[in-house]
Swiss-Prot record:
Family the UniProt entry places it in: Belongs to the ATPase A chain family.
GO CC list: plasma membrane; proton-transporting ATP synthase complex
Broad class of the protein's primary localization: membrane
Species annotation: Blochmanniella floridana
Topological type in the membrane: Multi-pass membrane protein
Protein name per the record: ATP synthase subunit a
Signal peptide range: none
InterPro entries: ATP_syn_F0_a_bact/chloroplast, ATP_synth_F0_asu, ATP_synth_F0_asu_AS, F0_ATP_A_sf
Intracellular or extracellular location(s): Cell inner membrane
Keyword Ubl conjugation applies: no
Superkingdom, natural source: Bacteria
Pfam families to which the protein is assigned, alphabetical: ATP-synt_A
Gene: atpB
Amino acid sequence: MLSTKSVTQKYIEHHLSNLQFDLKNLTLVQSHENMSFWVLNIDSLFFSVLLCLLFLVIAGFVAKYSTVSVPGKLQAFVELIISFVDGCVKDMFHGTSKLISPLSMTVFVWIILMNSMDLIPIDLLPCIADYFFGIPTLRILPSADINITCAMALNIFALMIFYYIKTNGIIGFVSSLIYHPFNYSLCIPINFLLEIISLCSKPVSLSLRLFGNMYSGELIFILIAGFLPWWSQWMLSVPWAIFHILIIILQAFIFMVLTIIYLSESHYEYKP
């Protein structure tokens, strides 16, 4: 009994471990070693960049061979996504920036592609990597890595600050922090505290929401594979995978919508 628990525990820990590289020592990091700021999860970086390149290749192919008369199935599918995202931007964004639609499209499709990696059998790619390349651990779901989701959220946060300052100037931006919601000099400390918390909570919630949902979904697949024999895993994994498709699309949609809303808020002119 103890040995069974030990094997199952090791299986779960193995699939939740990233392939890590230490930039300081230029060596691969073993799972039992202490982490540092200079350690990169290179499997998350590899798959996120690979999926981004896949998106660019498909978009470039469709743009190059698109036709007006009789569009193909791939072109029609891409145009459907573009129309959907463009409609969301027109409904929710009230500024004039031409960056928002391409950014929203990129965020939406990229997150869907990253989330979809969770539908691949959890042992398939790690076993291939171990057998052919000697890679000890491989985690293929980038959106279940807090570093990836935080990096995306921080980029959105940086754009928010940029547009806040571009729209209102530095003085206007600072004024919105210290004179809102209570337009009294005595309330400046309270206003500043409330606004800073409100501002910083946006990237935190944006990153943790995506990470939490995808991490929990990945963990359920691992638990199914770890506790059930191989011949009975499909009874739980197939229904969960079907339900998980909804989570994959929904989380990408929520991230995109919040990105549009946050950037729309940053285009409002502050009026004291």
